[in-house]
A protein has these predicted regions:
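Active-site mouth loops of central-metabolism enzymes
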Residues: 20-32, 105-121, 151-152
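An active-site-proximal structural segment forming one wall of the substrate-binding cleft
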Residues: 113-136
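Short, flexible, mixed-charge acidic loops at enzyme active sites
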Residues: 92-103, 243-247
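Local beta-strand N-terminus motif with an aromatic residue
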Residues: 12, 47-50, 78-79, 137, ...
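N-terminal binding-site loop/beta-alpha segment at the start of enzyme catalytic domains
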Residues: 1-84, 89-91
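Acidic (Asp/Glu)-rich catalytic clusters
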Residues: 7-9, 43, 69-76, 129-135, ...
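Beta/alpha (TIM)-barrel catalytic core signal, keyed to glycine-rich beta->alpha loops juxtaposed to Asp/Glu
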Residues: 33, 125, 129, 138, ...
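Short, solvent-exposed beta-strand-terminating loops
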Residues: 79, 83-96, 232-240
Length: 332
């Protein structure tokens, strides 16, 4: 099962497999486990779509992808690869990496941000090299431009980076150019100057957060045939019972309304015997213009289940009850 992401007809799977775990996210993952994760992608989809980044493990995720695909003899056209660009390797001179302390385990390199016309070209060439040289990249984007701007980066540097990416597309080296960000307002602002092929939203829309203003922007993207990938879904795991909320520890006082909303959501799921994770994914697909979702797991056994969520359909009464209890807004 595939779907079209871009106006140019780039096909992807409706469930995209995230790869941050291959960069040793939070813990060192043995190579055999990484190999089994990649095997599971191909059991779940004839031609899987994956999402990675030079930032993941300071390039370790990309290296792991290249190595596993070679070991499994996957042809270069047997997988669709999306890479978020904007971070490059540098020597590790401190006890742990400086770019995200405490997040990555067992790394041999540090990473630094490099977003500009020439910087993004350097990031692209390094990504190709880490993947093994012979394997191309299908989809590219600038990694977290919202954080770049918040840290003092300039819009001009982002525009320069996208000029480089669209030159790569014109030269036939990539097939689509997009954007991914946690702050959707930044995506909307940049869309005034850059006509992306696709966008990825990383913190909304979700069951817990789906502002009307965002939905209006998504309708605009849909009308312009810009494919949307929803990688928020679980709010960092909080929605389904986790302690992390969108990249931070949830606070019962500060986030009291979200704790209550989660409790109501899980209660309705229990009443209707609906899997909370599956319904969260289905909610993503119910949003305007969403053609795919991105899911990440370090457990190979969960990959077939994640892939199956694309076919999940909860009863209409379930969604009506969520609206009645004001867990979600009326979509009409």
């Amino acid at each position: 099962m595939t779907t079209y992401l871009t106006r140019d007809g780039v096909e992807i799977t409706p469930v995209i497999f995230g790869t941050s775990c291959l960069g040793n996210l939070y813990r060192v993952l043995p190579y055999e486990t990484k190999l089994e994760i990649v095997r599971a992608w191909f059991r779940a989809a004839a031609k899987p779509t994956i999402d990675s980044a030079g930032k993941y493990g300071a390039g370790l995720a990309l290296e792991s992808i290249g190595r596993t695909l070679r070991d499994l003899a996957v042809p270069s056209d047997g997988i669709t690869v999306s890479v978020k660009l904007g971070w490059r390797r540098k020597p590790l001179t401190t006890p742990e990496p400086t770019f995200e302390p405490g997040v990555w385990a067992g790394l041999e390199y540090d990473a630094e941000q490099d977003i500009s016309y020439h910087g993004i070209m350097r990031c692209y060439e390094e990504a190709v090299e880490l993947l093994g040289g012979a394997r191309g990249i299908d989809l590219v984007s600038v990694h977290d431009p919202d954080e770049f701007l918040a840290g003092g980066g300039t819009v001009d540097d982002i525009l320069g980076a996208y000029r480089a990416l669209f030159e790569l597309k014109k030269a036939g080296r990539v097939r689509g150019v997009g954007i991914g960000a946690k702050d959707w307002h930044v995506i909307r602002g940049l869309y005034n100057d850059i006509k992306f092929d696709w966008v990825m939203f990383a913190c909304a829309p979700t069951i817990l957060r789906h502002p009307r203003e965002l939905r209006e922007f998504m309708h605009k993207l849909e009308a312009n045939r810009v494919g949307i990938i929803d990688s928020a879904l679980f709010n960092g795991g909080f929605l389904t019972g986790g302690s992390m909320l969108d990249y931070r520890k949830a606070d019962p006082v500060r986030d009291a309304k979200l704790f209550q909303k989660r409790a109501d959501y899980l209660a309705v799921c229990k009443d209707f015997s609906v899997d909370p994770a599956a319904a969260a994914v289905e909610f993503g697909f119910r949003q305007p213009g969403v053609v795919a979702v991105s899911l990440n797991t370090s457990d190979p056994a969960r990959i077939p289940m994640n892939a199956s969520y694309a076919q999940h359909h909860a009863p209409a009464e379930f969604w009506a009850e969520l609206i009645r209890r004001k867990v979600i807004d009326d979509e009409n």
